[in-house]
């Protein structure tokens, strides 16, 4: 299988290097001989840099990691920073179901525009782009969703942001003649993050018994280290074109996850019972009250309707075969 040349002396620019996926990409690249130039929003904030520096120390290659400061909403800084790198891995975004919706959408779209433009100006020909199965969708029920499928729901700012920004990336890649490879991970679990993402931040509530019954919402899962490896392999393998869904553990629901937690950790208070669909309106109401009390909201009425229109039957066959 033809691959890219030896990683020695190649430098990969990683945006959002401190994020859940980003920091694991940095570690994987360092472990595989690459130089890494990673961007964070505030380079003076140790919480955004210390774990990256530790990765380089663990691998014994501190000299191969360079950290720079950059906000993806700033259009003017990126081309100069990326110039001289061999590829761009664009992971930076706001992954949240609770922050300002328009900010989430604007950050995704503007970040994509700024970074793809910078890649063109810097002469980078191959870009690896982090999207999500949120851009693939969970409909129709009963059929395995593949890379040919696109999200049709507009049920949350995050779903809108990931779908519209990936479409924008493909449009720009065609216009700029950039070889774009897109990774579409499902819910990403596994350690190695500073702040929990929506994929994992409900686990403490599950383990501590704050969720007495779990909603039967569709769920597919992938480990963050597999996501990191997939990004690197998408860059290295010449034939690795297009989109790549990462959902090796699929056809699950949140109830299945809770039962697995209970089986692995019998002393936890994880629920084993699922909430009947007929009671989901009460879940939405309870979630709304939590929002009034300043707690995170997980399930609006619109989000719940979107969940139940589809399932988590999502195929990772292409990624398994190619990457």
Give, region by region, the residue ranges found by the protein language model:
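N-terminal Rossmann NAD(P)H-binding glycine-rich loop of SDR-like oxidoreductase domains
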Residues: 10-34
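NAD(P)H-binding glycine-rich loop region in Rossmannoid oxidoreductase-like domains
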Residues: 44-47, 54-110
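A conserved pocket-lining segment of Rossmann-fold NAD(P)-dependent short-chain dehydrogenase/reductase
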Residues: 151-154, 195, 201-222, 226
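Active-site Tyr-X1-5-Lys
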Residues: 155-180
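Glycine/proline-rich active-site loop of Rossmann-fold NAD(P)-dependent oxidoreductases
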Residues: 175-178, 190-202, 234-244, 267-269
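Mid/C-terminal beta-alpha module of Rossmann-like enzyme folds, strongest
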Residues: 230-299, 316, 321
């Amino acid at each position: 299988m033809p691959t890219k040349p030896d990683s020695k002396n190649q430098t990969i620019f990683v945006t959002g290097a401190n994020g859940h996926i980003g920091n694991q990409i940095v570690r994987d690249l360092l472990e595989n001989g690459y130089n890494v130039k990673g961007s964070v929003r505030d380079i003076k904030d140790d919480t955004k840099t210390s774990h990256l520096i530790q990765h380089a120390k663990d691998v014994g290659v501190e000299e191969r990691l360079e950290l720079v400061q950059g906000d993806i909403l700033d259009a003017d800084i990126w081309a100069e920073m990326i110039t001289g790198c061999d590829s761009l891995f664009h992971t930076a975004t706001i992954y949240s179901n609770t922050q300002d919706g328009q900010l989430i959408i604007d950050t995704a779209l503007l970040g994509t525009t700024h970074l793809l433009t910078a890649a063109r100006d810097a002469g980078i020909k191959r870009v690896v782009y982090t999207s999500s199965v949120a851009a693939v969708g969970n409909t129709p029920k009963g059929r395995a969703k593949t890379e040919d499928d696109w999200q049709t729901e507009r049920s949350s700012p995050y779903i809108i942001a990931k779908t519209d920004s990936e479409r924008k990336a493909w449009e720009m890649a065609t216009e700029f003649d950039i070889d774009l490879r897109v990774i579409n991970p499902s819910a990403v679990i596994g350690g190695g993050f500073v702040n929990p993402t929506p994929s994992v931040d409900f686990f403490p509530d599950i383990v501590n018994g704050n969720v007495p019954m779990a909603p039967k919402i569709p769920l597919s899962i992938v480990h963050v280290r597999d996501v990191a490896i997939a990004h690197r392999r998408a860059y290295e393998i010449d034939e690795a074109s297009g989109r790549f869904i990462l959902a090796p553990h699929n056809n699950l629901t949140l109830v299945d996850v809770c039962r697995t937690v209970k089986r692995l950790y019998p002393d936890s208070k994880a629920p084993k019972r699922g909430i009947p669909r007929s009671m989901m309106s009460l879940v939405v109401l309870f979630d709304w009250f939590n929002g009034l009390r300043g707690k995170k909201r997980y399930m609006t009425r619109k989000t719940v309707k979107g969940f139940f229109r589809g399932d988590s039957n999502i195929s990772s066959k292409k990624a398994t075969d190619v990457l």
